Amino acid sequence: MEVGIAHYLTVSAVLFTLGIFGIFLNRKNVIIILMSIELILLAVNLNFIAFSAVLGDLVGQVFALFVLTVAAAEAAIGLAILVVFFRNRGSIAVEDINMMKG
């Protein structure tokens, strides 16, 4: 049995769907929302790499590396903001974040 593009697209669709459900079903915990965004970005990267391998073009793989770099920076900055917010407010609930000034 050969692993084709359909298998990669199926796994990518499942990851993307899990990420979307994670965002919509859990609106109270910011950390789970960030992890769901990372799942969505992982699904997009899997699509880029799968199509890059099938088409024989390296542009998709290079773009996936850029997306991974931006996702890592986004996760680091998001978690740093959450740590500072937790130290100031004592909670990371989404309802408390809506009450921020600025």
Swiss-Prot record:
Its EC number is 7.1.1.-. The keyword Cell membrane applies. Its main location: membrane. GO terms for cellular component: NADH dehydrogenase complex; plasma membrane. It catalyses: a quinone + NADH + 5 H(+)(in) = a quinol + NAD(+) + 4 H(+)(out). It is found in: Cell inner membrane. It comes from the Bacteria. The chain crosses the membrane at residues 5-25, 31-51, 66-86. GO terms for molecular function: NADH:ubiquinone reductase (non-electrogenic) activity; quinone binding. It is an enzyme of class 7 (translocase). It holds the Pfam family Oxidored_q2. GO terms for biological process: ATP synthesis coupled electron transport. It is a multi-pass membrane protein. Keywords: Cell inner membrane, Cell membrane, Membrane, NAD, Quinone, Translocase, Transmembrane, Transmembrane helix, Transport, Ubiquinone. Belongs to the complex I subunit 4L family. NDH-1 is composed of 14 different subunits. Subunits NuoA, H, J, K, L, M, N constitute the membrane sector of the complex. NDH-1 shuttles electrons from NADH, via FMN and iron-sulfur (Fe-S) centers, to quinones in the respiratory chain. The immediate electron acceptor for the enzyme in this species is believed to be ubiquinone. Couples the redox reaction to proton translocation (for every two electrons transferred, four hydrogen ions are translocated across the cytoplasmic membrane), and thus conserves the redox energy in a proton gradient. HAMAP family: NDH1_NuoK. This is NADH-quinone oxidoreductase subunit K.
